[in-house]
């Protein structure tokens, strides 16, 4: 079945509110119709108000880069999914390897966050991916499959069909190394196969799976040609308006 592609830029810890506003103003009017593709940027928490406001009359969607799994309470430094929804965010990125690595987030944390995000009417972009060591040991499919199963445990079939999964091999994030077209296809298919095993083929056929890891305008077309790659989660190439817009050339 045909799935609408989704291209999402992850700014990580970059841009102040003025830079975020300038970026949105530079890209918003040049984006293609939402009939063709969904386009989003994941802004740092300090930029979300500005980014959402700047994007509100355009087709650009806005993601938070993380949230907590409780709506309110004594959780210093955390971001409420309820407040993200009230602010007008569309997506929340969870489970990014940098969060898992630097902030010791577990599969259980990510599962709780996914449930909290859905409870507040937002859509999770759930990241998964293996280290170079796991990849070289030939255990990538097994490892990533376990991450996906754990992250989605207890969600409904309808919820899983509507979310986005982002496969990002850790060894390709910000390293300039990128997975081959075959690697990306095989792993995104493996992710989809896990969804099929856990929730049925119909759900697996609907869920969108992105590839991420050193995606740039020069290679995005190759990845998007893969039958099981439905989009890209893009870091460095999403920081400049021109390179971000160039990622959408795969549509031509």
Swiss-Prot record:
It catalyses: D-glyceraldehyde 3-phosphate = dihydroxyacetone phosphate. Its EC number is 5.3.1.1. Pathway: Carbohydrate biosynthesis; gluconeogenesis; Carbohydrate degradation; glycolysis; D-glyceraldehyde 3-phosphate from glycerone phosphate: step 1/1. The active site is at 96 (electrophile), 168 (proton acceptor). One of its GO terms (biological process) is gluconeogenesis. The keyword Glycosyltransferase does not apply. It holds the Pfam family TIM. This is Triosephosphate isomerase. It comes from Streptococcus pyogenes serotype M1. The gene is tpiA.
